[in-house]
């Protein structure tokens, strides 16, 4: 029985959505800049290629030109895990704000991060694929998502994220 559970869990750790670089993205970087307040070098999502009411999938092409590789680590560059979690959170923001008519007037703020596991190093040349699933309906502006980041078919990071959606104060 234990072996069966392990096999089922392993099968569930492959990406559910397949990115095809030959197809235009659902949202390109310009759309993403409209939806999120983040800007380079802290905008960590390049494309969204799937989105529905409960799921979003996107990618980040990790290049040697990323500013964090200057110090993390110069001889063996590795993407900081906290930035992988942030990238998953940014994808979550796109899921949560995706159907809001004026997403630029809202922000999402972390409330809680649970069960973060880093399973593989992310290095220059990797393409991170994010898959975010809304675990329950958004209530009182609070969203809870299951977030996963893959490199190829290998799970690199997973976490459960909770965030609050807040209308920006400078907007009426």
Label each residue range with its predicted role.
Residues 48, 79-103:
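Active-site helix/loop of acyl-thioester processing domains in fatty-acid/polyketide metabolism
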Residues 43, 53-57, 127-129, 144, ...:
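Intrinsic-disorder/low-complexity, polar/charged segments enriched in Ser/Thr/Lys/Arg/Asp/Glu/Gln
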Residues 144-172:
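Mixed-charge, glycine-accented linear interaction segment located at domain edges/termini
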Residues 39-79:
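Catalytic strand-loop segment that frames the active site of acyl-thioester-processing enzymes
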Residues 55-60, 125, 169-170:
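Short acidic, Gly/Pro-enriched loop/turn segments at secondary-structure junctions
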Residues 48, 113-152:
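Hydrophobic beta-sheet segments that form the core/acyl-binding groove
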Residues 2-49, 56, 162-163:
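Flexible, low-complexity linker/boundary loops enriched in proline and small hydrophobic residues
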Residues 2-7, 17-26, 92-131, 156, ...:
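Hydrophobic beta-strand-centered segment that forms part of the acyl-chain substrate-binding groove
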């Amino acid at each position: 029985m234990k072996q069966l559970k392990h096999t089922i869990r392993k099968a569930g750790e492959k990406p559910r959505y397949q990115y095809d670089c030959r197809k235009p993205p659902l949202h390109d970087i310009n759309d993403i800049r409209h939806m999120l307040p983040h800007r380079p070098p802290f905008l960590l999502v390049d494309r969204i290629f799937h989105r529905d009411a409960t799921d979003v999938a996107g990618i980040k092409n990790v290049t040697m030109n990323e500013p964090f590789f200057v110090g993390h680590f110069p001889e063996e560059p590795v993407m900081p895990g906290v930035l992988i979690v942030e990238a998953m959170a940014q994808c979550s923001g796109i899921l949560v704000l995706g159907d809001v008519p004026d997403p630029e007037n809202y922000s999402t703020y972390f409330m809680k991060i649970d069960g973060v596991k880093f399973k593989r190093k992310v290095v220059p040349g990797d393409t991170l694929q994010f898959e975010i699933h809304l675990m329950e309906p958004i209530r009182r502006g609070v969203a809870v998502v299951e977030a996963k980041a893959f490199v190829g078919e290998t799970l690199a990071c997973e976490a459960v994220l909770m965030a609050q959606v807040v209308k920006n104060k400078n907007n009426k």
